[in-house]
UniProtKB/Swiss-Prot annotation:
Top-rank lineage group of the source organism: Eukaryota
Catalytic activity annotation: (R)-pantoate + NADP(+) = 2-dehydropantoate + NADPH + H(+)
Name this protein carries in UniProt: Putative 2-dehydropantoate 2-reductase
MF annotations from Gene Ontology: 2-dehydropantoate 2-reductase activity; oxidoreductase activity, acting on the aldehyde or oxo group of donors, disulfide as acceptor
EC number: 1.1.1.169
Length: 365
């Protein structure tokens, strides 16, 4: 409902919706929104006339900020705003200060009551000021003064006006404000943490649940996207790295010393893991579940080799043992515990749980 032509179209659709609700719910009405630029579309006028004739319980809310993107209202129409257009079609019309939250609330409540009790349409024209740009591609300072924008942003700020009103009436206080901000921040952080745990949907989901039977042009677009991802995978990597930086750091450290061949095998496993990680990401994006499972198995195998390398590296650096690195060695060693609070030179300090005496002897034999 953002484009103007779609806004005009929905003027008609919402009228049908409002009449349909009469069949099963009497205490209800439909509400639709439009900007001052959208009122220049033909469907807006057809919608007003249709609603008036059908006596549809619908509330039309027009946000008149004086600009249709960069076109001023003086270049759109010569009438006294939008409210007179509703009157011309026999519709009760209200003009209200759209920057006053309490005034808007009062006007909408009155309009809804009229629409429901009298079964008739109502038009509300909210006179507002658009502080921001129309869109990210718009620079409103090219067609209006920056000082004007700053004045409305600071001196006529609608949020500040609302807060002053509720504080003057004793409905709000600085303590309430502090509690609200604290609770809102806490809830926001919790929501972000929960959202980060959700697994991202594959890009192929963009093409599902749009049509009952996927049309040919959509299939071609989906195929084109898959080909593009395979050619330029680096541009579509949206998941976190599967390999933490500390693994790469330890692998680099291993190359500085003359360690056994297993350490170099571990380094090669890191490189292999990088490739597997990339393939798993691509399969996740392309929703290729079968191949992903086999890749994950290969990834786990590479991780085992890397874990063995880390254990051997830590033991050697600490001078505790000089053992051949085998599956038994890895199996008898307890898992490495990474203490992320011990950060040095951008890397992590690896701490190793003690190995039990009897297990040490069995390994040595």
């Amino acid at each position: 409902m953002e484009s103007r032509c779609k806004k005009g179209y929905f003027r008609l659709a919402v009228i049908g919706l409002s009449k349909a609700k009469d069949c099963w719910e009497k205490n209800a009405c439909a509400v639709t929104f439009i900007g001052d630029g959208g009122t220049s579309e033909g469907d807006f006028h057809a919608g007003l006339n249709f609603a008036a004739v059908m006596e549809a319980p619908v509330v039309f809310i027009c946000r008149n900020n004086g600009w249709a993107i960069s076109t001023h209202i003086s270049e759109q129409f010569r009438s006294d705003g939008i409210v007179v257009k509703g009157q011309a079609y026999g519709i009760r019309s209200i003009r209200v200060d759209g920057n006053d939250a309490l005034a808007v609330y009062s006007a909408v409540c009155s309009a809804r009551e009229m629409a429901v009790t009298e079964q008739r349409p109502v038009l509300i024209e909210m006179m507002i000021y658009r502080v921001g740009h129309h869109s990210t591609s718009d620079d409103s300072t090219k067609y209006r003064a920056a000082d004007e924008i700053q004045y409305w942003k600071m001196s006529r700020n609608s949020v500040n006006r609302f807060r002053k009103s509720v504080e003057d009436n004793g409905w709000w206080s600085e303590e309430d404000e502090s509690k609200l901000r604290s609770n809102a921040r806490k809830q926001l952080l919790q929501a972000i943490q929960a959202a980060e745990k959700w697994e991202k949907q594959p890009l192929t989901e963009l093409f599902n649940d749009v049509y009952d039977v996927k049309p040919k042009n959509l299939e071609e677009e989906e195929l084109g996207l898959k080909e593009l991802i395979e050619k330029q995978p680096q541009d579509y990597m949206m998941l976190k790295e599967l390999i933490p930086n500390w693994i790469l750091g330890i692998g680099t450290l291993a190359l500085r010393y003359d360690f056994q061949e297993t350490l170099f095998n571990g380094w090669h496993a890191i490189a292999e893991l990088q490739q597997l990680k990339l393939k798993i990401k691509l399969n996740s994006l392309l929703n290729d579940q079968a191949d992903t499972e086999s890749l994950k198995a290969a990834r786990n195998s590479a991780l085992n080799v890397i874990q063995a390398m880390i254990i051997h590296l830590v033991l050697t650096l600490k001078g505790r043992f000089s053992l051949p690195l085998t599956e038994e060695t890895v199996r008898f060693n307890e898992p490495i515990q990474l203490n992320q609070n011990m950060v040095k030179d951008g890397g992590y300090t690896a701490e190793l749980f003690p190995i039990r005496k009897e297990e040490q002897g069995e390994v040595r034999r």
